[in-house]
Amino acid sequence: MAHLRSPSGFGDPGKKDQKESEEELEEEEEEEEVEEEEEEVEEEEEEVEEEEEEVVEEELVGEEQELEAPETFSEEYLWKVTDIGDYDDDFPDVRPRLASIVSPSLTSTFVPSQSATSTETPSASPPSSTSSHKSFPKIFQTFRKDMSEMSIDRNIHRNLSPGIPVSVQTEESWLQDLSDKVQSRKKASKEKAEPECLASKLREKWVINPEESKLNILYELEFKEDFITLFEPSLRTLPSIGPPSILAYKEESSNLGINFKDEEEETSPKCEFCGSDLRAFFSNVDVSSEPKGHASCCIAFQNLIDYIYEEQIKTKPPKAELIAIDPHAAHGSEVDRLKAKEKALQRKQEQRMARHFAIISREQTHFSEDDSKRLKTISYQLSVDIPEKQIIDDIVFDFQLRNSNMSIICCDSRIACGKVVRNELLEKHYKHGSKFLTSFPDGTTQIFYPSGNLAIIRVPNKVNGFTCIVQEDMPTNPAILAVLDSSGRSSCYHPNGNVWVYINILGGQYSDQAGNRIRAWNWSNSITSSPFVSFKPVFLALNRYIGVRILEQDKISITFLAMGQQARISVGTKVKLPNPEEIPILRYVSGDDLLLLASLIKIRRLFHKLEGCVNFPSSQVWEKLKQPSYLSSLSLKLIALCHSSGIKQDIMKTIRNIINEEI
């Protein structure tokens, strides 16, 4: 009977001896009961009742003994179970329920166990009977082995509610059952003494060992396969070692055993146009398919096939042309090959000559550049006779000064920061440190914008006086806003590039952005009698920093103001005419200008004639159309301008013919 001991009692030798003595006494009692079974049935019933009472008392008092050996079966119970035929009617409570397994109830109600474990009872049988039944009969050895392998936990059956199969048993009910057991044992142990390490014991109870023999009862019976597939993974949700089961490796299903060919055969392709089977279809694109008797099932499908085939041909890259490298006969005739050899020899000779001349040119360093040019160039007789360039005098005066006795006095002056700037080196700066003005001893002056870009530069000209150039505030390629010269000629420009104000020694004119002249004037001191009105001052703002003031011919100035710094440069001119009557009036209008004005009047007359023909298609009305009044006034003004400008008579006659020409 040594192999029926509890596995939890191996550690304590005193308890082992006590267990062995208990088992021997129980064995003797069971042997006596077997011998006197037929005669003393009533005594056995009383002994069974006494044993049940002792089990209840032992559960309440001796909890530690139950914890040490929860899986041990008493021999008395075993003998009773083996004699099932005799006690089937008398002891229905002692029958072992091995046919079905029930799940624990979710309720915490305590149900007393129907089975009882044997305790130590004094034996009244003689020692001879004990020795005669020390081992099991051979007929029960097999049953004993099977029972030991199943290792049924009787303590689990206490709180099981009959009628609930394992198929509906849940983890929650099973864990709740274990929790109820721990709570009941905890209450019973508190009555006697406080446990030493209660928390550690509770943790041990909650941890589930997957290899524990208690789990065997769930699959050692008639539904082992169902348990393995359904419930065994769920009982391993609280592993004591290793990661959670959700992180465990799960091998993917393999597709080796699947026959895809069968699946393809089951779903055969259908034509979207006529619905016929396409398994017999042979396409030029699908090379792997087998050729069939017919190409397509309908015309629409055949058109689709042709379109796909054409697109495939278009997108297909051209085949690479391979060069034949096999030995072959010589290309061309012998004459061609000889000519090719001669050309190759000629090229080699030319290369040698070129290298030879290069060496000679390096050695002959005493030759002059003219000699080398003569050797390399071909000269002609006419190319040697190069005409001399005419020297053009850079005179800024008007053409009237060439034949007249005029004297011009420049009125140049510079004022910076309220002080007159003399011919000396001077520098001024803005408040933030950048340069404002630089003046040199020769009269050159530079004025800068606050951004550092050049605004005004004043340099001396070749004749007399200075020239001022005004630029816009741009770092690269700035546009010129004005060019003013102290010798009498100046011009200012609009932002679009058209002339704004033009001045010469005789007068000036003012124009708008489109280039139309608004007014013109003559200087009062140059010509005594003038058909023009007297001069009125002109003020121009070239940008936010620079302005131009024209008060008189000798009072023309450029002003600059930025960040509290101010500068002014005067570029006026005084002209003295000993005989003003000798200078013709408006001599600056040439004959070509007058011819252009006459042609303009003629063009406008033609446009008026075309407009009349469009509006009045009848030819009778054309003769009644008259010339517009504004064209007649322009013609009269042009004739008067020709007389006042003093042009030649032949030019005057040509202008009249253009104006009076019949259209």
From Swiss-Prot:
Compartments it resides in: Nucleus
Keywords linked to the UniProt accession: Nucleus
InterPro entries assigned to the protein according to its UniProt record, in alphabetical order: FAM194_C (IPR029281)
Cellular component, GO, one term: nucleus
Pfam family, one: FAM194
Bias-annotated ranges (Low complexity): 112-132
Span list, region Disordered: 1-74, 106-136
Oxidoreductase listed as a keyword: no
Chief place where the protein resides: nucleus
Biased composition (Acidic residues): 20-69
Keyword Ligase attributed: no
Family: Belongs to the ERICH6 family.
Database matches in PANTHER family: GLUTAMATE-RICH PROTEIN 6, SIMILAR TO CHROMOSOME 3 OPEN READING FRAME 20
Name of the protein in its database record: Glutamate-rich protein 6
Gene (UniProt): ERICH6
